[in-house]
Structure formats: structure tokens, C-alpha cells
Amino acid sequence: MKNDIEIVDEIIWHDGVLLETRTICHHAEYNFILIVEVYADDSTSGRQQKIIEFMGVEHFSQIMDVTELIDNQSAGNIKDAIILYKKKKYKIMINLFGGFLSFSFRKLRVIDNEC
């Protein structure tokens, strides 16, 4: 069975749809909830909803042009994403058609996994 970081690493972000972002202050740390519809892997024919919680978030940046996100929603408003690991922290960068998300985090979990 794959762990959550492996599941997220296999996601095909291109042409995915950003549905919701949320920040939560939980036990003196910030967590970030990302709800997307993405292709789970290369063999998946349709998008699946994923709810991913990033824990211990630091250095959060988010810029979004809402009109562009909405205009590109049916075709997919996510261009691509990459997760890097350095100095015991992860960093995710999500490029959108109409903006970007970028933040570092300590760990993540897939809350709702349809795989």
C-alpha cells in the first residue's frame, strides 16, 4: 500500500481543477487544505477528487486571478505542480492558469482518497 506522499507524488496535476483552498490554525501550527479534481496516475481516465491536508505549513504564498481560474475550470485550471524535499521539509509549488500556490510543510495526508 502506498503512503500519502507517494499518492500525491503520482498525481497528474496538469489539467486538474482547483476547487478549494483553506488554512487552519490547529494546535499552534498552520495547516493547509487543498481540494482538487486530478488524474490519480497515468492510467486514470477521469478526474478524481482529492482532499489533501498539508501540516506544519510555513512561507505560504498564493496569488490567484479568480476570473482566469473560473474561465479555465472545465478544461483544467492547474498547469502543473512539483514537490521538493530539502532540509527535512517539503515544498510544493502549484502553477495555475491564473496564479500559483507555494508553501513549505512538514508532512501531508490524503483525507479523501478515491484510488
Give residue spans per PLM region:
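Surface-exposed, interaction-prone regions used to assemble/regulate multi-protein complexes
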Residues: 1-115
